[in-house]
Each structure stands twice: as C-alpha cells, then as structure tokens.
A protein has these predicted regions:
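N-terminal secretory signal peptides and thylakoid transit peptides that target proteins
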Residues: 1-17
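Conserved N-terminal/central alpha/beta ligand/cofactor-binding core
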Residues: 41, 80-180, 184-189, 301, ...
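Beta1/beta-strand and adjacent pyrophosphate-binding region of the FAD-binding site
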Residues: 46-58
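Short beta-strand "acidic-cap" motif of Rossmann-like dinucleotide-binding folds
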Residues: 74-79
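Conserved redox-cofactor binding core of oxidoreductases
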Residues: 130-211, 216, 228-232, 278-281, ...
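A glycine-rich dinucleotide-binding beta-alpha-beta segment and adjacent secondary-structure elements
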Residues: 189, 399-483
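Glycine-rich loop(s) and the adjacent beta-strand/alpha-helix scaffold that form part
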Residues: 209, 214-280, 490, 494-503, ...
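An anion/pyrophosphate-binding glycine-rich loop and adjacent beta-alpha core
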Residues: 257-259, 266-392
C-alpha cells in the first residue's frame, strides 16, 4: 500500500497513527535494544511518499520538520516514541543557548578557542553567524517563549517544565504546518539507490511491522547514543556502570549514528559527552543535599583508594569535573559539621546554575542530610570519627586519614601543594560529626556523532556529502571538539539542535527539491 503525502492534501492529525496501529498508544517510550544490522529485512506493510523525512522528534528533528514545511516541502517525522514521549531528551532542557554581547564574532572566537580548533571551524563559523537568526525564528515563528533576561525556556504556568513546554509548542506549530507524525516507528535503515543517493527510510514498530517512507532527503535526529551501553563504552572508554544517564528516555540508542555508519559515514568526536555534576542517585538533584553536599569547591573529593584526586574547584565546570571524575571508580565527598553549619549560615561558594546563590544561607541543609541518613538507599553517612565513617563504604581507610591530615596541613599553610586549589576554598575537615557523600558522575548525552558540514550534510568516507542525508543534534558532530563547552556557551547543545535542523531543511529545499516554487 502506498500513501502519497503532499502539501496539496495535508494529512494533518495523524499524529498517533503508528502508535495506534501497533496497539501501543499508551506507551510514551521504552527501553530499546541497539539496532541489529544483521536482522532480516522485511517488506513494508505500508509505504509513504514525501519530500523530506525526519527521524526523531527532539529539538533538532522538530526544527528540521518545521522549517521544511515552512519552505513548502511535504514532510513526515517518524519517531520511536509514542506521542506522549515526543521530544526525547529535549523535554528536560532548560536553556536554548544565546549569543554574547559581542555578537557572532565573539561567539565564534569563544568556541574555537575553547575547543582549540578540535571542532570544525567552518561549521562553527556558520553556527555563530546563524545563531541569532535561528533564535529569533524560534521565538517569532515557532512561538517558543523564553524567560526574561536569559534564553531559558519558560514554563507553561501549570508546572510543566520549560523544555517540555517548548516541545509541545513546536509540535503544535508543526501540525498546523501540515507535518505528518508517525509515532512508534523506529527508523532502522536509510535507503539508497544504485547511485548512492538517499531515497528514504524503513521503520519498524514494537510489534515488528515495517513501513517505508520514500523521500528526497532524510534527516537523522534520533537523539544520540546516551542509552546505549556498548556504544558509550566504545567511544568514551568509560564504564557505563560508573555513570548515570540523566537525559535518556531509554530510546537514545545511537540509531542515527548506526544508520549513518552503515552507509560509510565518517564520525566526528563521537567520544564527546555532555557531562554534568556528580549527583546522589535517588535524591533530588536540585536540592540542598546534592548542590551543597557534592558540588562545592570548599569540600574534598576522594576516590576508592582514599586519595584526594583534584582541585575541587573543577566542580564549577561540567566538562572539567566530568573529565576528572570519569577517571575514578568511586567519588566520595567528606565534610565535617563546621562545613554543614557554614552552608546553613553563609551559603555556598559554588553556584550551580539557578539553584542557590553564592552567600545565600541554606538553612535546610542539615534537615536534608538527616532525612537522607534514614533512606533505604544510603548515599550519605555520618560518624564521629573518620575511621567509622569510612567503614560504611569501599574506601581505603588509612590512606583517607593520611590524605585528610595532609590536606589540613595545607589549610594551615594556606597553600594546596598537591593541586593548588585557590586558598579561599581551603577548609579543614576536623570537627565531628563527619559526613561522607557517595556520589556518582552523571551525563546528559553525547555531543559528537556523524560528521556533518555547514549545511548539516552527512560526510562519507570519501569526504564528500552523502547526497540526501543530513544529521542534527546529538546525531551530528561538528560544533564540538571532544568536550561540551557549557562554561562559555551554556545551552549550546539545544541551539546546535535548532541550527542543525534549520540548516538541513534549508539545504534540502534549495538543492534537492527544485520543484519548489521560489
């Protein structure tokens, strides 16, 4: 069965078609398995026709679909989730990204300097040049609302977070434009003709039925590989068991990257991870317990050997804290009662996003510690001696005691002879009771993937674009080197998703679909 989808006969309102057909409309998303390239291919039960097909409904995918429809292309978006799970990782996003006061030139210089030109300078230059235009388009065309003063997504006023609100706003606008959504349809194969030109995708739903979408252009925006243990470990050389994926919904399995690799696509810094701060799994990550207990420069970090392993001021930057904490098997923070009282009376020294202001008292800190001490999943421990404290976890006790004594000597001397921490953050561990926080490194997603150029075209092994194939968001690599640049460009992952989606649609409309009217 073939279904022709065009601007003349807009099939609006078929948002849950795939999910309903599969009998899974009530499931928003589910843990998936990696794509199996050896799985037998089957004939489709239904075939669709369009100009532009997008795989993935996050920020990049929605932006690509919206811009394509605005430009007159018949557009279909397929997504592994059902309608309730639309948006993927982007549902939890907070920032859109912004252009500094110095404009495009300052943004470009900040980015290439931070990445030491490990990013693609051509891609970065166009990103900087187009960033404000795409931000304005997001606000003016899509209707996404930002908080006053910063480009943070505004909540809807009914408790829905900003990222999810932005996704729903974009989704509704896409439907108005005539974009057709096929949910519960996991893209698993990009189709090409004998000349190597992309001709569409095949998708499979949760009951194994296959559909085919024929198109002149395919944009891979499936959300990266944050939920794929094998792919994460292959690219990063970090054990997946030592990290917590805070951004994944169970469906970010690297599908876009896998499909691109099957066509011979090159990769660009696939190891680049958007790390965030250490967290206390099972506890509110924005509460006083986590922000004040495991994210402060005036604490001490210890690994499983009892060694202090860094200047704790690295916690102020997600990338530096991620880089150094990912080298440890365990991450423990040890503080004393004086520190707890200091937090309650004087506040934090390290600001974590918009949660607690530096110098603002946090009187609830002790109460949150006490509540955590009686939880069934202990992440916080209390004892009158360091020996008793360390007995609760897998840490070398003698080494820990020696490290604390050495560090206290550094405080007396006013100089950290090991890691040269700023003296203002040197604080002794000496007043009982003592507290240990057993934290774990967390990350949101990858920020590298298929190599793309300044039009979001996927680059093949011959260093030429694969005609008709695009990638965006966490499926695409080019803007970032091996790290996430949150310290100089907060929200750049969201803005990259927007810009890369916009680029793909613009290029496809101008180069691949000549029938479009000017």
């Amino acid at each position: 069965m073939s279904m022709d989808f065009s601007r003349r006969d807009m099939l609006i309102g078929s948002a849950a078609l795939g999910a309903v057909a599969a009998g899974a409309a009530h499931v928003a998303y589910a843990k998936e398995e990696p794509l199996d390239a050896a799985a037998p291919d089957v004939d489709p039960v239904e075939t669709y026709e369009c100009d532009f097909v997008v795989a993935g409904s996050g920020t990049a995918g929605l932006c690509a679909a919206i811009r394509a429809a605005e430009l007159g292309m018949s557009t279909i978006l397929v997504d592994v989730n059902t309608e309730n799970g639309i948006g993927g990782n982007s549902r939890s996003a907070e920032n859109c990204g912004e252009v500094p006061e110095g404009g495009a030139d300052e943004l470009y210089r900040n980015l290439v300097d931070y990445h030491r030109f490990a990013s693609n300078a051509i891609v970065t230059r166009r990103f900087a040049d187009d960033a404000q235009k795409v931000i304005d388009w997001t606000r003016d065309n899509q209707g996404v609302v930002f908080k006053e003063g910063r480009l943070k997504y505004e909540e809807d006023g009914n408790g829905t977070n900003g990222g999810k609100t932005a996704i729903y706003t974009m989704y509704n606008y896409a439907l108005e434009l005539g974009v057709q959504f096929l949910f519960d349809e996991r893209a698993y194969k990009v189709l090409v003709n004998d000349e190597g030109r992309v001709t569409g995708v095949k998708c499979r739903n949760r009951v194994g039925e296959v559909i085919q979408v024929n198109a002149k252009a395919v944009d891979l925006c499936t959300g990266g590989y944050g939920c794929n243990k094998e792919m994460f470990e292959r690219f990063t050389n970090v054990s997946y068991d030592r990290v917590i994926n805070r951004g994944g919904m169970g469906t970010q399995m690297g599908d876009g990257i896998t499909m691109g690799e099957e066509l011979g696509a090159l990769l660009f810094h696939p190891e680049a991870i958007n790390y965030c701060s250490p967290i206390l799994p099972g506890h509110y990550n924005k509460g006083a317990l986590t922000i004040c207990g495991v994210n402060q420069a005036d604490t001490c970090f210890f690994n499983e050997s009892g060694r202090r392993f860094c200047d704790e001021e690295v916690i102020s930057d997600w990338t530096t804290s991620g880089n150094i904490c990912s080298q440890q098997h365990q991450i423990y923070m040890i503080v004393d009662q004086d520190f707890v009282q200091k937090i309650m009376d004087e506040g934090v020294v390290t600001k974590r996003h918009n949660y607690f202001e530096v110098g603002e008292p946090v009187p609830q800190f002790q109460d949150e510690i006490d509540a955590a001490l009686v939880r069934e999943n202990p992440r916080v421990y209390k004892a009158d001696t360091i020996e008793e404290l360390c007995a609760n976890v897998d840490i070398d006790v003698e080494t820990t005691i020696a490290e604390i004594e050495k560090f206290n000597g550094y405080v007396d001397a006013g100089f950290d002879a090991d890691f040269m921490k700023d003296p203002q953050y040197l604080r002794k561990i000496q007043t009982p009771p003592f507290y240990l926080f057993r934290s774990q490194l967390a990350f949101y997603n990858n920020v590298g993937g298929l190599r793309v150029d300044e039009f979001a075209r996927v680059i093949g092994s011959d260093y030429k674009p694969i005609v008709g194939l695009y990638a965006g968001g966490s499926d695409a690599g080019g803007l970032f080197g091996p790290y996430y640049d949150v310290s100089i460009a907060p929200g750049s992952t969201q803005l990259w998703g927007r810009v890369s989606g916009y680029w793909a649609a613009e290029h496809a409309a101008s180069e691949l679909i000549p029938s479009l009217e000017a």
